Amino acid sequence: MSAPEEMTLKVIAHIRTAFPTKFGIPRQSGLVDSLRGEVIFTPEYRNADAVRGLEDFSHIWLVWQFSGAVRDSWSPTRMGVFATRSPFRPNPLGLSSVQLEAIEHRPDVGPVLIVRGADLMDGTPIYDIKPYIPYADCHPDAAAGFTAQTQFHHLTMVCDAGLWA
């Protein structure tokens, strides 16, 4: 028996973040640990049993859709589509590792995952959540391809306190 060539994914949750548009979102998860988000489950998964045991993990994987960057085609440039993390993909799915800060049980929406370091736009559909397992998910000797040349720059922002009044 062979697997089908296509499948339908079910949205299990949406994330609430401070980013109403794609502009300003960090390019990778974990780059800005202070960014807080809330994963709100769809009614079918608003059940404490769905997250039982997740509280024992410090990090989780979010599988999500690039809902704000959908395009029919990919235009090749310097790298092939599968050598990049571009949102313009045959299947516009994203994968983010985020810190699980807490699980709050709210009477109106059930369990809510409080996460840090998410790189997702507000309202992004979540298709799956998996625990981050350090011995299997971390590969310290992994080759980084073209990203090994990435330079990190720290910026200091100075703002007149009078502007906040």
How does the language model describe each region?
Residues 1-97, 101-165:
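Glycine-rich, low-complexity intrinsically disordered segments
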